[in-house]
Amino acid sequence: MEVLSTSSPLTLHSHRLLSASSSSSHVTSIAASSLSSFASSYLGISLSNRTIHRFSTTPTNLRRFPQRKRKKFTPISAVFERFTERAIRAIIFSQKEAKSLGKDMVYTQHLLLGLIAEDRDPQGFLGSGITIDKAREAVWSIWDEANSDSKQEEASSTSYSKSTDMPFSISTKRVFEAAVEYSRTMDCQYIAPEHIAVGLFTVDDGSAGRVLKRLGANMNLLTAAALTRLKGEIAKDGREPSSSSKGSFESPPSGRIAGSGPGGKKAKNVLEQFCVDLTARASEGLIDPVIGREKEVQRVIQILCRRTKNNPILLGEAGVGKTAIAEGLAISIAEASAPGFLLTKRIMSLDIGLLMAGAKERGELEARVTALISEVKKSGKVILFIDEVHTLIGSGTVGRGNKGSGLDIANLLKPSLGRGELQCIASTTLDEFRSQFEKDKALARRFQPVLINEPSEEDAVKILLGLREKYEAHHNCKYTMEAIDAAVYLSSRYIADRFLPDKAIDLIDEAGSRARIEAFRKKKEDAICILSKPPNDYWQEIKTVQAMHEVVLSSRQKQDDGDAISDESGELVEESSLPPAAGDDEPILVGPDDIAAVASVWSGIPVQQITADERMLLMSLEDQLRGRVVGQDEAVAAISRAVKRSRVGLKDPDRPIAAMLFCGPTGVGKTELTKALAANYFGSEESMLRLDMSEYMERHTVSKLIGSPPGYVGFEEGGMLTEAIRRRPFTVVLFDEIEKAHPDIFNILLQLFEDGHLTDSQGRRVSFKNALIIMTSNVGSLAIAKGRHGSIGFILDDDEEAASYTGMKALVVEELKNYFRPELLNRIDEIVIFRQLEKAQMMEILNLMLQDLKSRLVALGVGLEVSEPVKELICKQGYDPAYGARPLRRTVTEIVEDPLSEAFLAGSFKPGDTAFVVLDDTGNPSVRTKPDSSTIRVTDKTSIA
């Protein structure tokens, strides 16, 4: 017998003839008889009866062609010997279906009918509920070929024994080619109906798709079902089919192929041991859906389609979705929605930790990598995904500091990557790519970079909507659309050191966890509250339950007597009477307030809706500040306005809360106002970051703010300013006495005031968008202190006009223009000029100082009273309009604190006494003990204030 080569597409696969089956003689004769027409129609060859007899009796002789024939003719591959009995049965059914419809060729819709007829699953074709009768009706309705009852009966009574000579169309032959390719991809040594089904759904010319659409079936779901059935069958033994599952697959008669011995199994174990099959996980639904990124995925597919150097490397910051792109590609392959050349591929994710773990001996890691590369090259259908690929660079014996005979892992990958033998998708960050890959030009040119940028807020919302179902199922909750929008908006605005969509996903994840825990806590508290109530509080509920119980009992009694109500109506009464109980599995609603609460805890920035208590705090903020800072109403109003704008949400989101410059004489309350704001609104004075600019008088001290440059001490520690803001972004930053700093310090403030961020010595961008920036300056105070002949060009009179606020403000602003650069002054939101303190205001300041002194005496158990003449004396001696309140503080120390300390040392006071400061007959202050009913005891701390 001579076997001639043919122009069929399957000749590309080196066809051979089908060997005899090792199954029963009946099935063998069926396969042999049907294969004659199958081979003749598909390949254009003829098999005589003698040949068929040789098929079933002497399979080994048929393979041994004479050497002369081998040299002259192209051999035909072992495609048909790999068809299982079920596959042959499906092909015969398809021929019968085509003949019953009056066709002279088998098209893809007939092949679909054959596959459906062969599938004996009670749930229909691939578990979809599609039966052969429904499929025939769909085909007849589409092509208007409704047959008579006799033809239908003939089609339904097809048998294996009847042979046909029905040829196959070109599109059907392509389906067989795709089935062969997918079988090779899965390392299966047979072709089952599921392989043919996957090939049909992959390269369908549209005919089978029309039938499935008419039946209401989803082609992607059917493909996934076929893949699941195939992979479930072969999962027990690596890539070998299971011999025990006769109901689904039969082992091909030819047995295992050459090369599937221990050696092949060992290489196979290397791939399975160190890699995770992302395609299989996607088929099982274990990978989250991937939304968007169409351009990046298209670019990756283009690179994978190249002949050489077909290795994309995904570059992007942590959290932008590099790994998700590889997972999305695996999902598209599993759902058969990827391009055709990728459908035969598997994406295997390399676990670098497993690869390196346990490599104790020298060269053991290199041996693992070499075996892994060999297995991937041998398979030819594996795309290796290496996440954080920079961890492999520098590993190996060379990277460990050893000398000689060691290899870097990158050097092992280079040859295979360059020739296209090893196809790889890598991912790393931009910094690691710059530091690791760009140093090795030979390695970098083998990868094609694909830049993965942070998605926009709109795209991030779409991503969260796609993931919402997964997180709702995990937390047993429901996310509102407002919660999704809030997660993206709040994370983008207030979490500066992370990237979308990762930080938004983390927000909804933690918000779901928080809502679930809060619901459990509330349920527990309600249960405890119910148990603690007296019966009178819920007597009405008890009466309602008793009434319902009586109705149910009467209904059951009537049913027993056979009087009125049937079982169905009785059930209706019982079910309708009882109130619906709130189940434990009822989903919890997660709204924007839950998202805001998590964002506030995470970032330290109050982003929740303004509560009633906080609203009252903001409304009374000015009064609280005036109670501590006297005589500076303009400054108090200015700083209060800035805080209110920020909290309401009207401030510019790309700039700090405010950048203010406090100018005025010394000792008038510039620093004290900042401390008061930090204590009243930000929690405490410790929440204020104060930088005394007298420490930055030299040029090189600018490094103290943002961090030392490389090579200097403290490079790894970061800057005092930037590190403090990174840890507490919602704070007050005080640059005290800014004019004392070196002029180069002002240059670094320009970007801070305008753009709201600084870049530290580590290259990290630090956001100041939630910080209140305040600078204090004494520019102009020297002239005021000198009195009449000031240094800023004006003369002060003895009367109050010389110290007027308007004149002082104009002169100080003019002096600021001469001292600071215009670009700095132009970026300051508001310049606040502090007034000089009047004599009447000194009494209020004195009362505040005495209250502070009383608070300190509480720890000693002694009260304090100061007579009015002593207060007037203190104000008279401590008042100096040029120096503000600081002389007053020194006078209090001299007149009150020093005599008190002497009296304590002399033992004049015991706990419970009250120190009374009065003037003696000579007009000098003296301290006396006042043990009467008004004495303040040690435990009575509240009366001090």
From Swiss-Prot:
All copies of domain Clp R, residue ranges: 90-233
II, as annotated region: 590-781
Positions with a binding annotation for ATP: 316-323, 664-671
Domain of life: Eukaryota
Transit peptide: 1-89
Region (Repeat 2): 168-233
Cofactor: Mg(2+)
Region annotated Disordered, chain positions: 233-264, 555-586
Documented EC number(s): 3.6.1.-
Temperature dependence: Optimum temperature is 45 degrees Celsius.
SUPFAM superfamilies found in the cross-reference section: Double Clp-N motif (SSF81923), P-loop containing nucleoside triphosphate hydrolases (SSF52540)
Annotated tissue distribution: Expressed in stems and leaves.
Principal location listed in the UniProt entry: plastid
GO BP term, pick one: protein-containing complex assembly
Annotated catalysed reactions: ATP + H2O = ADP + phosphate + H(+)
Effect of gene knockout: No visible phenotype.
Signal peptide range: none
Gene3D superfamilies linked: 1.10.8.60, Clp, N-terminal domain, P-loop containing nucleotide triphosphate hydrolases, UVR domain
Induction comment from the UniProt entry of this chain: By dehydration and salt stresses. Induced after one hour of dehydration-stress and reaches maximal levels after 10 hours. Induced by cold, ozone, senescence and dark-induced etiolation. Down-regulated by ozone (at protein level). Not induced by heat stress.
Alphabetized UniProt keyword annotations: ATP-binding, Chaperone, Chloroplast, Hydrolase, Nucleotide-binding, Plastid, Repeat, Stress response, Transit peptide
PROSITE patterns: CLP_R, CLPAB_1, CLPAB_2
Residue segments, region I: 271-523
Segments crossing the lipid bilayer: none
Note: CLPD is consistently found in two distinct forms, the full-length protein and a lower molecular weight form porcessed at the C-terminus. The processed form might be the active form and not the full-length protein.
This protein's name: Chaperone protein ClpD, chloroplastic
